Amino acid sequence: MAKEYSFDISAKIDMQSFKNAINLVDKEVANRYDFKGTTYEVDYKEKDKLLVMVASSDNKLDALKDIVITKLLKQNLSSKVLEEQKTENSSGNNRKVTFKIVDYIESKEAKKIAAEIKNLKLKVTAQIEGDSIRVKGAKLDDLQKVIATIRSMEWEAPLVFENMR
């Protein structure tokens, strides 16, 4: 009986790393000269999976976004985990931007990924299971080709390859 190998493609986020990145943002902004004497806030709402940033101007808000993305990348998280929802005026001449935290693969994108895997013409199967995709195959080399191909393509969700068995 031949051994079958598999792995999962998902968009899970290491929430501890995410929280660490947000804490590092607070520390860096508190020490930056260009933010001295201005109002700013970076608030992570865990229940709603939202990140809310408030700054005194659009320039400060852009700088805050750049700092957040830099810290996420240093924690090995993709910048795609944040999806900008809306930018609006806040109290006291402040600007506010809300980001939704993306930790799932949408069904349309999951279908596209499964179709791409099928188009590779390898002896592997891709099965959509909720918010992840299980890829099975008899050869490890085929699975590694699938991973390399999917990684090389541009996707909306921050894809993670896990549970290689």
Swiss-Prot record:
GO molecular function: nucleotide binding
Pfam families found in the cross-reference section: DUF520
Keyword ATP-binding on entry: no
Keywords tagged on the record: Nucleotide-binding
GO cellular component: cytosol
CDD domains: YajQ_like
InterPro entries membership: DUF520, UPF0234-like_C, UPF0234_N, YajQ-like_sf
Function recorded in the entry: Nucleotide-binding protein.
UniProt-listed PANTHER family: UPF0234 PROTEIN YAJQ (PTHR30476:SF0)
Family: Belongs to the YajQ family.
Protein name as it appears in the record: Nucleotide-binding protein Suden_0039
Organism encoding this protein: Sulfurimonas denitrificans (strain ATCC 33889 / DSM 1251)
Upper lineage: Bacteria, Pseudomonadati, Campylobacterota, Epsilonproteobacteria, Campylobacterales
